[in-house]
C-alpha cells in the first residue's frame, strides 16, 4: 500500500493508519489484547466508504495530483506486468541514447509488438538519469527509429505517455527539439501498422503528442492531457501559480472532458484510489483494452487503416 498520501487523501490515510495499528496489536497476540477483529472490520468498511465517496467526486486539480503520484506505475512497470520477452533497444543512431524514453520489442499475449514510453524514474538518482521523464530530441528520434522498425517487421506500436513535457533546455533546442517532435507526428500519421497510444499519467504538451498519434488514444481514469501544466497556465493568465486549481478546472485536461470533445477514444478504469494502489490490476485493465483494439484494427488492410487514421485526425477541432 502506498505510503505517500495526497492532501485530499489525508482522512483516508488517518483511517488506514488506525486499521494498521489495530492489526499490529492483534498480531502481537498480547494476553490482555481484546478481540479486535470486529473493530478492524468496522474501520475497514468505513475506510472503503470514504474512499468511494472521495474518488467519486474528484476535481480536475485532484486528478492532476493523482496523475503525478510518485508511486504511479511507469512504462517499465507496465512492461513487467503486461508483456513478455521484452528486449530494450537503445539510441537514435545519430547522437545519444535518451533514458527518459524507453522502447523495445516485446510480446503481448504472444504477439510481437513495439513498446515505447516515457520513464520518469523513482528516487533522486534514477530521476536524474531519466531526466524526470522529459525526453530530449534524441529520445524522440529513438522513438521514430523504433516505430519505423516496427513498420518494417509489421509489428503494432503501443505507446505509454507520461511526461510533464519535452525537455526545454538550450542543448535540446539546439539539436532540434521541435523538428524531432514534428517528424514523429508525421511518421506516426503514416505508419502502415496499428498504433495505440495510452496516456497513463501526465500528458504534457508536445512532449506527449510526439508519441501520441495513433488509431486509438486511451486515457487512464486519473491521467491528464493538456498543452500546458495547470501551474504554467495560471502563471501566464493570472501571474500566480497558486491559482493552478482554477486553471486545471478551466483547461479541461481530464479524461471525461477529452472524451466528450472526441480527442480520445477510451477511458480505462483504475483501481479504487488510483493506479498506484495496484499496478498489476491497472496493467491488466490496459492489456484487455489493447487486445480488444488490436483485434478491431486487424480487420483493416493497410490502405483502410491509414484512411481511418486520417479521418480521425481530421475530425479534431471545430468547424
From Swiss-Prot:
Its EC number is 2.1.3.15. One of its GO terms (cellular component) is acetyl-CoA carboxylase complex. Acetyl-CoA carboxylase is a heterohexamer composed of biotin carboxyl carrier protein (AccB), biotin carboxylase (AccC) and two subunits each of ACCase subunit alpha (AccA) and ACCase subunit beta (AccD). Component of the acetyl coenzyme A carboxylase (ACC) complex. First, biotin carboxylase catalyzes the carboxylation of biotin on its carrier protein (BCCP) and then the CO(2) group is transferred by the carboxyltransferase to acetyl-CoA to form malonyl-CoA. NCBIfam families: accA, AccA_sub, PRK05724.1. Belongs to the AccA family. This is Acetyl-coenzyme A carboxylase carboxyl transferase subunit alpha. It comes from Aliivibrio fischeri (strain MJ11) (Vibrio fischeri).
Amino acid at each position: 500500500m502506498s505510503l505517500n498520501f495526497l492532501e485530499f487523501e489525508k482522512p483516508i490515510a488517518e483511517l488506514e493508519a488506525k486499521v494498521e495499528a489495530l492489526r499490529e496489536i492483534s498480531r502481537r497476540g498480547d494476553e490482555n489484547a481484546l478481540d479486535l477483529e470486529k473493530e478492524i472490520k468496522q474501520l475497514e468498511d468505513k475506510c472503503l466508504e470514504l474512499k468511494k465517496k472521495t474518488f467519486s467526486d474528484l476535481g480536475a486539480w485532484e486528478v492532476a495530483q493523482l496523475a503525478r503520484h510518485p508511486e504511479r506505475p511507469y512504462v517499465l512497470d507496465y512492461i513487467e506486468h503486461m508483456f513478455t520477452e521484452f528486449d530494450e533497444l537503445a539510441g537514435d543512431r545519430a547522437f545519444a541514447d535518451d533514458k527518459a524514453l524507453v522502447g523495445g520489442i516485446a510480446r503481448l499475449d504472444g504477439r510481437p509488438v513495439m513498446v515505447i514510453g516515457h520513464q520518469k524514474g523513482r528516487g533522486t538518482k534514477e530521476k536524474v538519469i531519466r531526466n524526470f521523464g522529459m525526453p530530449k530530441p534524441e529520445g524522440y528520434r529513438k522513438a521514430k527509429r523504433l516505430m519505423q522498425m516496427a513498420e518494417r517487421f509489421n509489428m503494432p506500436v503501443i505507446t505509454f505517455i507520461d511526461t510533464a513535457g519535452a525537455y526545454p533546455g538550450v542543448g535540446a533546442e539546439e539539436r532540434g527539439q521541435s523538428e524531432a517532435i514534428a517528424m514523429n507526428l508525421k511518421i506516426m500519421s503514416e505508419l502502415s501498422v496499428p498504433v495505440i497510444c495510452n496516456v497513463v499519467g501526465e500528458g504534457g504538451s508536445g512532449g506527449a503528442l510526439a508519441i501520441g498519434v495513433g488509431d486509438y488514444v486511451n486515457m487512464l481514469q486519473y491521467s491528464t492531457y493538456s498543452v500546458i501544466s495547470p501551474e504554467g497556465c495560471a502563471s501566464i493568465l493570472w501571474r500566480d501559480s497558486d491559482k493552478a486549481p482554477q486553471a486545471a478546472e478551466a483547461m479541461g485536461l481530464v479524461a471525461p472532458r477529452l472524451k466528450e470533445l472526441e480527442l480520445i477514444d477510451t477511458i480505462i478504469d483504475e483501481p479504487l484510489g488510483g493506479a498506484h494502489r495496484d499496478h498489476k490490476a491497472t496493467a491488466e485493465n490496459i492489456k484487455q483494452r489493447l487486445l480488444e483494439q488490436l483485434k478491431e484494427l486487424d480487420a483493416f488492410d493497410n490502405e483502410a487503416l491509414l484512411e481511418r487514421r486520417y479521418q480521425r485526425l481530421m475530425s479534431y477541432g471545430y468547424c
